[in-house]
Amino acid sequence: ILKDYNSYSNENLLDFYLLTGGVAKYIELFILNNSFDLKSMIDTIIDPNSMFLEEGKNRLIEEFGKEYGTYFSILALISDSKTSKSEIESILERNISGHLARLENDYNIIKSIKPINAKPNSKVQKYEIVDNFLAFWFRFIFKYQSLIEAENFDRLKEIIYRDISTFKGKFLEKLFIELLKEKQTFTKIGSYWERNNQNEIDIVAIDDIDKKVLICEVKLSEKRLNYNDLLLKSQKFVQDYKTYEIEY
């Protein structure tokens, strides 16, 4: 689509993926508004007449029913990198086991993720919002609802531009994981971390047939890549793959 409209670049591709997740309705609205880069897409979303501003509420309030406030609070925290059950419960000061289970199994809005080599009964896990736009909506629109109500759209855009790089990083990881899966050369692809989010590795791809492991650090800027740091973080992980060829 971006190539069709002479707007293709790596950055525009990531932004388009971040804000649409491939959902046809969102893509059509951006095409209609000739919005193919981050600024024009944000201008389309953060507009007094934009359907995007109420999208999260319109999609979810009726589905969640009277407990929508709790569900929205959980999703807002997950979108803001509070991704473990213990983190969320400490902030909300209540048990949310049932809510997380329903969000994942009944509503299919979140999914739980475990480290790539975790045992089946491991309780080390995180949650992420499946829908790209909903993740953005909870992170920036729901969180700053007061600015929208005050019609302070310029201030909201400033906040989005200020914080979007950190938010983008997780979606760049997600995009690369999807691209690696499309290659169909690995038997397992995921992320790795140890307890308390220690030694977090963005992407690990394992080929159990040819005995190869690919360990990746994903950054928006090449200057932020640190090869030695990646070697240190992967020390414990690679102990389980001593007979494998390791590539960084």
Model segments located where?
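A cross-kingdom feature that marks ATP-driven nucleic-acid transaction machinery
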Residues: 123-248
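Hydrophobic residues on short alpha-helical segments
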Residues: 71-79, 177
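Short acidic, hydrophobic short linear motifs in intrinsically disordered regions
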Residues: 78-91
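P-loop NTPase catalytic cores that bind/hydrolyze ATP
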Residues: 21-25, 82, 106-107, 130
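Short, cationic-aromatic polyanion-contact patches
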Residues: 42-46, 60, 64, 112-141
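Amphipathic alpha-helical "lid/sensor" segments that cap RecA-like P-loop NTPase cores
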Residues: 5-61
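Short amphipathic alpha-helical interaction segments
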Residues: 90-108
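Short amphipathic alpha-helical boundary/capping segments
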Residues: 2-3, 56-67, 87-90
